[in-house]
Amino acid sequence: MGALKPWHIAVLVVVLILLFGAKRLPDAARSLGRSLRIIKAETKSLHDDDRDLAEKANAQAGYQPLPPQVQQEPYPQQTPYQAPPQQQPVVDPVQRARDS
């Protein structure tokens, strides 16, 4: 289930041809390819811009090691939780007389 079988693809192609016509499909595929190429170029330029900004910031500030971390005092030790002692169930004297 969920696997795309060859006959699924064939049915999709037939439906697309019926909906859009054989003449418009190559144009649609071409424009889709152009759009994907543009998106790829834009994402690459965004990554390059981020990398350039990081390099400029490092060059301007110079390499500075991180300041040492301040150790925080540990939480004060708490006594472990102790469950209250279990009590014997209270037996009603009337019930005790019936059980005997």
Curated annotation (Swiss-Prot):
Keywords: Cell membrane, Membrane, Protein transport, Translocation, Transmembrane, Transmembrane helix, Transport. This is Sec-independent protein translocase protein TatA. The gene is tatA. The chain crosses the membrane at residues 1-21. NCBIfam families: PRK00575.1. Gene3D superfamilies: 1.20.5.3310. InterPro entries: TatA/B/E, TatA/E. It is a single-pass membrane protein. Residues 69-81 have a biased composition (Low complexity).
